[in-house]
Amino acid sequence: MSSDSMRNIRNFSIIAHVDHGKSTLADRIIQLCGGLQAREMEAQVLDSNPIERERGITIKAQSVSLPYTAKDGQTYFLNFIDTPGHVDFSYEVSRSLAACEGALLVVDAAQGVEAQSVANCYTAVEQGLEVVPVLNKIDLPTADIERAKAEIEAVIGIDAEDAVAVSAKTGLNIDLVLEAIVHRIPPPKPRDTDKLQALIIDSWFDNYLGVVSLVRVMQGEIKPGSKIQVMSTGRTHLVDKVGVFTPKRKELVALGAGEVGWINASIKDVHGAPVGDTLTLAADPAPHALPGFQEMQPRVFAGLFPVDAEDYPDLREALDKLRLNDAALRFEPESSEAMGFGFRCGFLGMLHMEIVQERLEREYNLNLISTAPTVVYEVLKTDGTIIPMDNPSKLPPLNHVEEIREPIIRANILTPPDYVGNIITLCEEKRGSQIGINYLGSQVQISYELPMAEVVLDFFDKLKSVSRGYASLDYHFLRFDAGPFVRVDTLINGDKVDALSIIVHRSYADRRGRELCEKMKELIPRQMFDVAIQAAVGSQIISRSTVKAMRKNVLAKCYGGDVSRKKKLLEKQKEGKKRMKQVGRVEIPQEAFLAVLQMDK
């Protein structure tokens, strides 16, 4: 396709931290370009999932193509690709950005720059995108436009002199944003090959059409009837339909170079069209794939078990359906003595895990128990093999283990200067090692290397509480480091409960064992016999607490009486309790499994 026909196309996305008004700005742009009539407008048009609306976050990438007549009289075609804003979905963000030539950096004029938008902005600059700063929420009394501009320049390092000040809520200055998109973001450039190359930005499952993929055509064109090949898997598919979203789905006769739209090619599940992969023509393939594709690796694992064992087949079916839409979700069957049959699931992070569990419970009416989330450790065995371990109860016997390695992440925290001390204390508590502190304008950037296991559970919540909600966090995986790790097992009346095993640093083992026993003592109801709760490392018991038995007062009917008579009755009761203990089973309530999560609180 010639550069003339691409001259009036503008592909852009919006980079913003959660809650800075990205979806509202998108709504206004759609309204101004006439994508939807006023009566069809609803808040957050592009957040199609009810959980996205409720939590006010964007999870999946969406796109919309809008015609816009600029003030110079020309009609431009704006392709807006929506990106998720949360750190769990950073790979999806990088793929959305790779499909664009420019990005709007939306910053809340009242709050200033936050870490997540910094990370995504760096990704955009690395990929050579033109970044246009937009200051949102200027209608708020606390908005400080000059401070926000200074922060963008100091923290991100891009010129904010021409930043567009808008209020997405009231619609103020939205036309200036559209003019900035048209005049400051460059049109798509022709590539070095004329063979078809299309980047898959996202894929989702449609009950009637099968898998629908959102693609950006880099070169060549896609028409219904052409045979395409997915470059990472080598599979070929026949294209049924192509089109764009306006935000409604609209069919076209072809998608040309520079355009963003959807294709439907009878692919059965989303693993057949992985995000970030390249599509090309099967008969005349491109010489190489587009750069940047990687398999999504789950970083956090947890067991999901149905409360009612009869729901197991329904849980499997629900997970299968969710996986059609969520390429990052992994699961395999797992059985646990304490919990019965369920699944071991892998997620990108804690938010991803919460969303999956919420969707299973809400959309499929399942009642679920989840075990404490763990990260993936690497275990070097004595025979030299390295195995990934996502479940503490699957740790090989200690005489076969040479060393255990934990994942380390690099965390960048942005905070106002007042909270630096609190945040450093928190990071040190979490076994972090400091990399550097930079003072950037009115913000401070603190960099730490932290064990991922410490970050996964509650680091985000604690960071928000020590900084009164002002600090923001972005992190990425670095490497695996060896350390003195042990598995703490929980025994109840001498039986090991596999779902309560945790892997901890040796220096924390005693404290965690003690806390776990105390917590379990509160949560396990009293039985007719004593319940011994023990925490053990290997064969060594490190802590114990006992839930005392409920007992009947057998001496009530002896008034004065002889002491030997009383002793006889007490001995008889003791015998009965002993027998009961041998045959009795302790039911462990759901709260006890979640106790592992709350121990640090």
Swiss-Prot record:
Its main location: membrane. Keywords: Cell inner membrane, Cell membrane, GTP-binding, Hydrolase, Membrane, Nucleotide-binding, Protein biosynthesis. GO terms for molecular function: GTP binding; GTPase activity; guanosine tetraphosphate binding; ribosome binding; translation elongation factor activity. Belongs to the TRAFAC class translation factor GTPase superfamily. Classic translation factor GTPase family. LepA subfamily. This is Elongation factor 4. One of its GO terms (cellular component) is plasma membrane. It is a peripheral membrane protein. Its EC number is 3.6.5.n1. Residues 7-189 form the tr-type G domain. It catalyses: GTP + H2O = GDP + phosphate + H(+). Required for accurate and efficient protein synthesis under certain stress conditions. May act as a fidelity factor of the translation reaction, by catalyzing a one-codon backward translocation of tRNAs on improperly translocated ribosomes. Back-translocation proceeds from a post-translocation (POST) complex to a pre-translocation (PRE) complex, thus giving elongation factor G a second chance to translocate the tRNAs correctly. Binds to ribosomes in a GTP-dependent manner. GTP binds at residues 19-24, 136-139. PROSITE patterns: G_TR_1 (PS00301), G_TR_2 (PS51722). It is found in: Cell inner membrane. GO terms for biological process: positive regulation of translation.
